[in-house]
């Protein structure tokens, strides 16, 4: 669900109203997204501006080339949402021109290779290779196009979602610890009555309060787009996963 929320946020920003309505309608009817999100590359993870996947017109055909990695559901989703540099309209500036494309996974030239992971087995990842994939102009998402500036802000949403998962795991661990402290007995009494156990549970509760505060503050900053957005998200990202 967290992955779906993030993917829908991306579509909402880069698609026009009609394109987003089609994706949302299908999601409401089926409960699953139809596409995999392909942004990260082997040499362009956090350094997204080093993206090498590109589109270029060759003999009047629009061609996509490149490689994406850590693509969720990359082997199974019928469509792929790909971020690529538009080589046809390169211009001087801080940010290279970037566009998003929603294309069928079974296009000629698209290959998927599974990534073996230790955890998160419910969400399979894959590496995707695009080898001279011919694109139709209809595959391009035609919503508001602010390129990397827009993408960087959306990644802040993803960091909030990830830290929310960490907070959820911490709360689940707290509930398990409290349940065990109430059910386990030693010397004829519940171990939760021992001062050392009480202190451990108190420290856990303090950490959860701190995590909640930082998460909600960062989420509010992202929603409002305030000047402290990047700082709030960075502090949350630094503290919450480690505390969990």
Question: What name fits each language-model region?
Answer:
Residues 1-31, 72-79, 222:
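Internal helix-loop-helix
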Residues 44, 69-75, 157-161:
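Glycine-rich phosphate/pyrophosphate-binding beta-alpha loops
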Residues 45-47, 62, 103:
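Hydrophobic, small-residue-rich alpha-helical packing segments that form membrane-like cores
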């Amino acid at each position: 669900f967290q992955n779906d929320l993030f993917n829908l946020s991306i579509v909402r920003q880069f698609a026009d109203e009609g394109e987003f309505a089609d994706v949302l309608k299908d999601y409401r009817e089926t409960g699953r997204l139809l596409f995999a999100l392909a942004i990260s590359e082997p040499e362009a993870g956090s350094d997204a501006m080093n993206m090498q996947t590109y589109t270029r017109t060759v003999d009047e055909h629009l061609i996509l080339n490149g490689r994406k990695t850590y693509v969720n559901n990359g082997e199974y989703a019928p469509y792929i949402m790909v971020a690529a540099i538009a080589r046809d309209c390169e211009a001087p500036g801080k940010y290279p021109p970037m566009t998003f494309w929603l294309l069928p996974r079974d296009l000629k030239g698209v290959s998927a290779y599974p990534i073996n992971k230790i955890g998160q087995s419910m969400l399979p990842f894959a590496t995707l290779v695009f080898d001279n994939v011919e694109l139709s102009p209809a595959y391009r998402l035609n919503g508001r196009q602010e390129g990397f500036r827009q993408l960087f802000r959306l990644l802040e949403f993803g960091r909030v979602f990830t830290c929310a998962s960490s907070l959820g795991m911490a709360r689940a661990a707290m509930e398990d610890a409290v349940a065990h402290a109430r059910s386990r007995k030693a010397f004829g009494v519940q171990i939760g009555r021992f001062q050392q156990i009480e202190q451990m549970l108190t420290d856990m509760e303090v950490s959860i309060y701190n995590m909640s505060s930082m998460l909600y503050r960062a989420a509010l900053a992202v929603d409002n787009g305030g000047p402290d957005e990047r700082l709030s998200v960075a502090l949350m990202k630094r503290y919450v996963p480690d505390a969990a």
